[in-house]
Amino acid sequence: AITCGQVSSALSSCLGYLKNGGAVPPGSSCGIKNLNSA
C-alpha cells in the first residue's frame, strides 16, 4: 500500500515544476517511478 508520506516525498521533487511549469527536474520523473514501485 502507498502511504501519504510516500506520495508527499515523491511529489515534493516536482512541486516547482507543477507551480512554475517548464522542464521536469532531471531524474525526478515527478515521483511516478517511485510510486509505481511502492
Swiss-Prot record:
GO terms for biological process: lipid transport. It is found in: Secreted. One of its GO terms (molecular function) is lipid binding. It comes from the Eukaryota. Keywords: Lipid-binding, Secreted, Transport. Plant non-specific lipid-transfer proteins transfer phospholipids as well as galactolipids across membranes. May play a role in wax or cutin deposition in the cell walls of expanding epidermal cells and certain secretory tissues. This is Non-specific lipid-transfer protein P2.
